[in-house]
């Protein structure tokens, strides 16, 4: 029995494109068709069929009922838009004939299926008619079979990190729901089993009795939980076959490592989902009266989408993650490749994760790491050079503000390079006090600080360095207190700027350009020539000596005070790897330095060779 299906409305079909009676034969090909041949009857049959008029076409056959059912099923199974039918050749002898034709079915999504076939004809009481058989629609179509169109979605592309390994790959999540009607009298037992079994995975189900009442009050299934493949393997044997439990596999892109930059990977997934599905393949199959596939009549393979690459580097990310995991509180590290702007790592410990992606969006006073900006501005304005002798008293009064050094240390008069390496607040407070209100704001922009970068796949905020007319505020801004704010992402850009000689445009997803709200003027060569050796001196003979064993590291430490505590900062670079490390409320900068040291020590020995 062929499944009945009505053809599409007549208006949705294109009329017969061409019906060409090429040749007729009475044992001889190439002769002019005889007037009483089967060609005219075949033309009428194809003409009706091509516009979806299956009833008329069926009446031109010797078995109208069976033909109509088969033709309706063919149109429905192919979901066809229209059909072009072309007669290639007509042959007949006495009361039998054969029409050789070419069908072009126009299918959804601009697909076409073209094939040649043969239609048997017979003359009955002087009138030619179609001798109906299923193989008249297609040479390989058997009796009581029809067509079905199958889509073969390509395997979704994966998302890779910079080293080539997958960070997101196609898989399934399993949606569990409860259908009270299907559960019937077993509803209470099913609900109690569901609450007990799913308790390790969700606390949202609550009281079994209330859940049963909720499920009974609606005709729709009630959501229970969404499980990963591994969790489904644990739950399904106990729950999957109970009355009323419905388990629906849902395709998804799944993290290959739940501990690999989870917040970043979640943002990447949202950004790239529309790029991961390639061109679907499709097949036309013959199916029997039970809907079971019998044979493939036509197949077009799909083309998968190319994989998407993100700039996170597994080696760097894992090293940074290991480093932040050694600290309590809220610790984070951002690593950027100065030569390209590629974001190599965004690592946070569990304490930081509670507040979202603090590493790229959290704003904090940067403390003395901001002295990279202040020193650069002073050099660019010809206020000082690394060798200029400047005062580093234990405290200094500027306007109505008294500025102390950490612990009140006093170096007297020293070269600016020494004041930078020892992190003299008083030195840089005095320098900033002599700058114009927009001096530090303009200087910060040269390092990307305060610039808005629309990085595809991740939300970023660099920082804020507002102009300051008030002398006391400008003084505090000079050593990273006051109203100056920066994210670890922003300070990593500052360090990357010194390393590269220009501010790199950050990027996370390969092939997705970053929009920048303004062009940052480059830092000058004299700024670079001064800042680089001063940042190296911080490591060799200053506040970051503890990381001196990790190769040629350049950096600037910072401890930013806030009421009741201080933040621990360290920013810098080594080779083509710039970083910023922050421990919120972590106290002395030595802790951020130690955390950064753990990161470098966790990299392969030859990584920065």
Predicted regions and their residues:
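Conserved SxxK-family serine transpeptidase/carboxypeptidase catalytic domain
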Residues: 32, 92-95, 211-243, 247-264, ...
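C-terminal region of N-terminal signal peptides and the immediate post-cleavage residues
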Residues: 23-45, 503, 607
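Short pre-catalytic segments that frame enzyme active sites
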Residues: 137-153, 167-188, 192, 282-370, ...
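Small/polar-residue-rich segments within soluble enzyme cores
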Residues: 102, 131-133, 147-153, 166-305, ...
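Short solvent-exposed beta->alpha transition segments
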Residues: 34-40, 51-100
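Secretory targeting and sorting signals
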Residues: 1-33
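Beta-lactam-recognizing serine transpeptidase/beta-lactamase-like catalytic domain environment
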Residues: 295, 331-362, 377, 381-586
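Short beta-strand edge/turn micro-motifs at domain boundaries
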Residues: 110-149, 249
